[in-house]
């Protein structure tokens, strides 16, 4: 797959599978209109397709299917210790999509699901109902924790649903993290100061090597700049940093490139973090044998695989030395394991 996917269109999914139970759901009806009827298949339950035995994750990555389904059970989960809650009293993530349009070698999703296909749960109203009891106090919800919701916004409409819900609930803060270049799906909306649009940025060489099917660095930066100019709060995330030969030059040049495009004063925050993954997810990633990222000699502590502490510290020192030339330390957040 080439690095030229600015947003989601039906051509990126070869077929649309729909659970019979959600055929009449308003979101299903809207999505159906975007597909050729000959490529729509009705099923009883999403697991008939998503959980089939003997699937090839690698092969499916080149011909993804979209599955529309009804989610039973919890949409909301406590935020992971591998992520940043940005100081909010409560940090939750929403799981309204299984799988991702993109195919990044270092992503834990590679080892999490049996399929590379995407399941979109259309009953997002149930997520909102589950969230209401948490909104008596300050709460952050990450909508793209285990997918890229903005990448499929042209089909799903879920980001707009989240933004509409957030307007009515003043204790709700959203982080919408993306590698997409699809800000145009939100361009005409009024910015909400409690919503942060966060772009994951990597050197172009890292994108080409590890972040398959994702937009280029140039495209992501343009989208982030458009968001800033439209009045949105924008966070830039150089995370995960991949320790590879010449990483110092790759990532310091990246920071220069970012701030040649974006006024540092316009960036709400910059986050920096090196690669980390749960030991169980890393084991699953190794079984796929797709990338050298899985076979680095990581250190494992408290079930978390990370770079050896000296390397992790060196990565952070190199990036901070460059980043603080542009942004003060109080607007930079870093991830470090607890020693």
Say what each PLM segment does:
Residues 130-134, 187, 217-230, 319:
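Structured alpha-helical segments in the cores of large, soluble enzyme domains
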Residues 2-29, 256-339:
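Auxiliary Fe-S-binding modules of radical SAM enzymes
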Residues 67-90, 105-198:
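Conserved Radical SAM active-site core
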């Amino acid at each position: 797959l080439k690095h030229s996917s600015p947003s989601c269109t039906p051509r990126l999914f070869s077929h649309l599978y729909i659970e019979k139970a959600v055929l009449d759901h308003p979101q299903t009806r809207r999505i159906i209109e975007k597909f050729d009827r000959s490529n729509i298949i009705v099923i009883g339950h999403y697991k008939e397709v998503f959980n089939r035995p003997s699937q090839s994750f690698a092969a499916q990555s080149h011909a993804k299917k979209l599955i529309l389904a009804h989610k039973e059970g919890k949409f909301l989960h406590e935020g992971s210790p591998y992520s940043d809650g940005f100081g909010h009293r409560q940090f939750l993530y929403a799981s309204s999509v299984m799988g991702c349009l993109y195919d990044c070698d270092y992503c834990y999703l590679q080892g999490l699901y049996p399929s590379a296909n995407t399941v979109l749960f259309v009953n997002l109203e149930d997520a909102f109902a589950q969230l209401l009891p948490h909104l008596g106090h300050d709460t952050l919800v990450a909508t793209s924790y285990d997918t890229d919701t903005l990448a499929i916004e042209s089909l799903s409409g879920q980001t707009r649903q989240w933004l509409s819900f957030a307007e009515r609930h003043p204790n709700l803060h959203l982080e919408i993290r993306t590698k997409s270049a699809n800000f145009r799906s939100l361009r005409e909306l009024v910015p909400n100061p409690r919503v942060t649009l966060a772009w994951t940025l990597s050197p172009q060489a890292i994108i080409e090597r590890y972040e398959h099917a994702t937009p280029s660095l140039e495209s992501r930066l343009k989208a982030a700049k458009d968001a800033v100019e439209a009045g949105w709060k924008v966070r830039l995330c150089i995370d995960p940093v991949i320790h590879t030969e010449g990483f110092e030059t790759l990532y310091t040049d990246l920071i220069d490139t970012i701030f040649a495009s974006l006024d540092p004063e316009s960036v709400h925050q910059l986050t920096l973090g090196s690669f980390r993954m749960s030991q169980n997810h890393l084991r699953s990633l190794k079984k796929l044998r797709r990338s050298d990222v899985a076979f680095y000699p990581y250190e494992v502590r408290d079930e978390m695989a990370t770079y050896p502490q000296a390397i992790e510290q060196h990565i952070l020192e190199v990036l901070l030395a460059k980043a603080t030339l542009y942004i003060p330390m109080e607007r930079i957040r870093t991830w470090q394991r607890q020693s």
